[in-house]
């Protein structure tokens, strides 16, 4: 599956890598791998989003951070991986 990072998602990911928080980076990588393998049946308590984010899903990184993503045409699009649907 091909990953497409939106600008914010990539900036979030680089921010996590630069933070020195290896545990969170490993968790993000594990979640992305699970999404690639299992789609919306992945780990991380996947939830469909509503409103202006309809069509997007989220999975929990930790108590306050989520990966916001969608699957389309064999692609994994990552909108963000920090914060909570901002």
Describe the function of each predicted region.
Residues 1-65, 71-86:
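Basic, Lys/Arg-enriched alpha-helical interface segments
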